[in-house]
Design a protein with these regions (language model features):
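Positively charged n-region of N-terminal signal peptides that target proteins for export
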Residues: 1-5
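Sec-dependent signal peptide cleavage junction
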Residues: 18-26, 315
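Glycine-rich flexible loop motifs, especially short His-Gly-Gly/GGXG/HXGH segments used as catalytic or interaction
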Residues: 249-290
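Selective detector of the "anchor" transmembrane alpha-helix that sits immediately C-terminal
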Residues: 319-340
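C-terminal low-complexity, Ser/Thr- and acidic/Pro-rich disordered "stalk" regions positioned immediately N-terminal
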Residues: 289-318
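Cytoplasmic C-terminal tails of single-pass
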Residues: 345-359
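Bacterial N-terminal signal peptides
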Residues: 9-17
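A structural signal for short, hydrophobic/glycine-enriched beta-strand patches
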Residues: 25-262, 292-298
Length: 359
């Protein structure tokens, strides 16, 4: 009887595992795919476009929701580093004019005495011009304590400077906790989505060499929260930068931040993965004609978009496979129950054995 109970529990565990939308092995596979995506882009950038499309396609087969999130993250990351327009010492003119827009000003390390450094002041000058051009927009200043004076934060010093130079206090939002670009993105997203529900678009202000990293982190946080957690999407609609003459744009730092946001490991010293050939279906990628050449964004979007019918068929087969395994488990349990030998009846201890008197 005990063996039957153990067998029944084993089959029930199997059925419970089949009923779960994503198994532990699937989660492990998704993490492995995510690590590969980041490493491929880190080492090969746009040369890995076909490979990235192939990996996100495989991820969608395992879990359509998670695969779609990664697809959007990789598309945005690539676009930010290759095709995103950067406004240097000028302000974009086509952004929302109401209070749905928030201008996010990235902090910069303070002096030991808590005073503002010249580069941060340059960022603030650009932010002030931005805010004057969009008088209904909120202005979020983000940055924690980086000087030696307790309680003096980048955000607090930035807010004070903006007020001293004519910006109304009611327009300023303080985020005084963050000590890294990734934390800037995470904490700013939380603050805006929880306390300012009308805000649905953001524009970033920082230094020229820092804009790609900042935009990549903010886009990744928004995609992760809206795609995985069902949160609100904050669209990145513009930027403005101060000119420093520096060209530093560390993809390693971006990859580390991306991994941190997505909750996957990152090995800076990992060997560069080798590119491989991918046959892109004709339905997915069509050669541009001479008369109507698509933009870089349209081309990348086509590469990252598999055929809808293919995804639908794959989902149906996965459902059929689950039911086949379920029925097979029940049949195996029934067969085991039938063929399992029964224990012989125990003799009643009170019943005395019959004596043979024929001697």
């Amino acid at each position: 009887m005990r063996k039957k109970i153990y067998c029944l529990l084993l089959v029930l565990c199997l059925l419970l595992q089949l009923a779960l939308p994503v198994s532990a092995s699937t989660m492990g596979d998704m993490e492995s795919y995510g690590v590969r995506l980041i490493q491929y882009y880190l080492h090969h950038q746009e040369k890995a476009t076909d490979v990235i499309w192939d990996i996100t396609r495989q991820m969608k087969e395992l879990d359509p929701k998670q695969g779609a999130v990664w697809e959007k993250i990789m598309f945005d990351w690539s676009w930010i580093n290759s095709d995103m327009p950067v406004y240097e010492d000028t302000i974009p003119t086509d952004l929302p004019t109401d209070d749905s827009l928030c201008i996010v000003v990235m902090g910069f390390g303070l002096n030991a005495d808590g005073s503002i450094r010249p580069e941060l002041k340059d960022r603030l000058k650009v932010a002030l011009s931005f805010a004057m051009q969009y008088p209904n927009a909120h202005v979020l200043v983000t940055g924690g304590q980086t000087g030696a004076v307790d309680g003096v934060t980048e955000a607090g010093q930035m807010a004070a400077w903006l007020q001293q130079n004519g910006l109304a206090k009611t327009r300023i939002i303080l985020e005084p906790q963050s000590l890294s670009t990734t934390a800037n993105a995470v904490n700013s997203y939380k603050l805006l989505t929880r306390a300012y529900p009308k805000v649905d678009s953001i524009a970033l202000v920082t230094s020229d060499y820092h804009i790609a990293q900042s935009c990549a982190m903010f886009a990744a946080v928004s995609n992760y929260q809206s795609g995985y957690k069902g949160g609100k999407s904050l669209e990145l609609v513009g930027n403005a930068v101060c000119d420093t003459g520096l060209t530093e744009n560390s993809l390693v730092t971006q990859a580390w931040g991306m991994s941190l946001i997505m909750g996957i490991p990152f090995d800076e010293k990992a060997k560069a993965p080798e590119l491989y050939h991918v046959d892109i279906p004709v339905e997915v990628y069509v050669e541009p004609t001479e008369t109507e050449a698509p933009t870089a964004e349209e081309t990348q979007e086509a590469l990252f978009t598999p055929e809808p019918e293919t995804v639908e068929v794959q989902s149906k087969w996965k459902a059929i496979e689950k039911w086949v395994l379920l029925i097979a488990g029940l049949v195996a349990l029934a067969i085991f129950w039938i063929i399992m030998p029964k224990k012989p009846k125990k003799r009643n201890r009170r019943e005395k054995p019959k004596m043979n008197w024929d001697v």
